[in-house]
């Protein structure tokens, strides 16, 4: 996966006869997380960071490569009912990743101040930090117990994750971008069970 991202970066930088147009910006949004595990459910999170666009107008007008570096949360939870004690047990974790997407996209100019765009490509997640806790509920009384201070350092979760994603959206006045995206995790986030991230995101960006 790392070799693929490096190859895309080097490939775009090595085009000698193309007018390369760099644009930098900031982005933030909401993550609606899900997982493929039977007993696991996702939690709503967020993403915030910086992005860059490399326009390639001499290749095809509207073609571009999109890069990002974002702090992104991908929370999960799972529950269990203990019949012997009539207690509901729930584990919750909020892992935070450095999310690095590399997408190839195309912009469709609808008017001077309005464009539609679509992009797709791979991403890499690098686990940074995140706590896990257990909540025990008996009747109307709930007790929270810390389980792990860092799910990655304690090796409860895999630190590296990767997958494929796409984005569609609109660009207003050449600066504001509103987008909806979806990421398919291709790697299990645990060693001993097959649980993969699925993330729907809604984001707003400002590109200079």
What is the predicted role of each segment?
Residues 196-208:
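Outer-membrane beta-barrel "beta-signal"
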Residues 26, 48-50, 69, 100-104, ...:
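Membrane-embedded beta-strands of outer-membrane beta-barrel proteins
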Residues 30-34, 54, 71-75, 108, ...:
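Transmembrane beta-strands of outer-membrane beta-barrel pores
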Residues 15-19:
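Sec/Tat signal peptide C-region and signal peptidase I cleavage site
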Residues 20-53, 115, 127, 138, ...:
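Short glycine/proline- and aromatic-enriched beta-strand/turn motifs that initiate or cap beta-hairpins
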Residues 54-59, 108-112, 172-174, 208:
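Outer-membrane beta-barrel strand-turn architecture
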Residues 35-42, 74-96, 127-161, 165, ...:
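Extracellular/periplasm-exposed beta-strand and loop segments of Gram-negative cell-envelope proteins
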Residues 22, 58-63, 174-180:
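Repeated loop/turn-to-beta-strand initiation elements of outer-membrane beta-barrel proteins
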